[in-house]
Amino acid sequence: MQTGDTYKIGVDLDGTISEYPDFFRLFTKAMAEAGCKIYIITDRPPGTESDVAAELHHYGITYHVIKITSNKAAFIQQEGISVLFDDMDHYFRHLPQEVAVFKIRQNYNFDFQRSIWRD
């Protein structure tokens, strides 16, 4: 869960930061200033870290680590990340209960007219 006094926070890029850049700009800055370590975890093509860094700079996102992986759950457990923001269930479905997950609602994962999550 928590490592010493430092929370490790994972944040997805596509469908998360990209949809709410103003919130995540403020959030990542505040959390980093509070001593948290911010991981940007994205399932982009391997070798695109510099493109991701440029996009994060454009959004004004504060971060410490960029990780490109399709197996986010394994990376999160390996690094001891205790909080995740993501929009896609399959990335966090197999995380242990100790990892707090904040799911981002989008048209493709939430039916706003019926007020229910989509499968």
Q: Residue locations for each model-derived region?
A:
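Short low-complexity, flexible loop/linker segments enriched in glycine and/or proline
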Residues: A54-L56, G80, A100
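Alpha-helical substrate-recognition element adjacent to the catalytic core
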Residues: M1-S70
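Phosphate- and divalent-cation-binding pockets in alpha/beta enzyme and binding domains
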Residues: T48-D51, F75, R93-H94
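Alpha-helix boundary recognition
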Residues: A32-E33, Q77, P96
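Short, solvent-exposed coil/turn elements at secondary-structure transition points
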Residues: T69-K72, N107
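Conserved Lys-Pro-Asp/Glu-containing loop-to-beta segment of HAD-superfamily phosphomonoesterases
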Residues: A73-H90
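Acidic, Mg2+-coordinating phosphoryl-transfer loop and its flanking beta/alpha structural elements
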Residues: F85-D119
